[in-house]
Amino acid sequence: MDHSKYLLTIFLENDDSFFKYLSEQDDETAMSDIETIVTYLNFLLSLLIRSKDKLESIGYYYEPLSEECKTLVDFSNMKNFRILFNKIPINILNKQITVNKGYLSDFVTTLMRLKKELFLESPEPITYIDPRKDPTFLNILSILHEK
């Protein structure tokens, strides 16, 4: 298994394997590995956005990928709520790195092949600040638009 496939497989697994792996690496290697993950996630995001644009071109509004989409959280199960918003550092000393060699591994292999075949150009990273939601920029814009 090559390194990128290994990284993606442990990253997408629903456990702490990726954190355990990163904790055992030096800073430079960890940052390089994170950059590899970001590259593949950007590819997936680009693929999703292009698909959303195709749907919108025929008049279908795909809300989950839209800019103004609001996420609802189900508060009926407080255990899931705690897991979702738990920002306490993870104790990974006694954890082991597990590599899923089933469907997740197949998905990662397919994703890597698709990325090589499609070669979607990733746009430059852009930070979008919505002045309607940022009071500082809203004030600056109101000053600039005064007559």
Curated annotation (Swiss-Prot):
The keyword Hydrolase does not apply. Induction: Expressed in the late phase of the viral replicative cycle. Keywords: Host cytoplasm, Late protein, Virion. It holds the Pfam family Pox_J1. GO terms for cellular component: host cell cytoplasm; virion component. It comes from the Viruses. Its main location: virion. It is found in: Virion; Host cytoplasm. Late protein which is a part of a large complex required for early virion morphogenesis. This complex participates in the formation of virosomes and the incorporation of virosomal contents into nascent immature virions. J1 protein is required for DNA packaging during immature virions (IV) formation. Belongs to the chordopoxvirinae J1 family. Homodimer. Part of a complex composed of A30, G7, F10 kinase, A15, D2, D3, and J1. Interacts with A45. This is Protein J1 homolog. It comes from Sheeppox virus (strain KS-1) (SPPV).
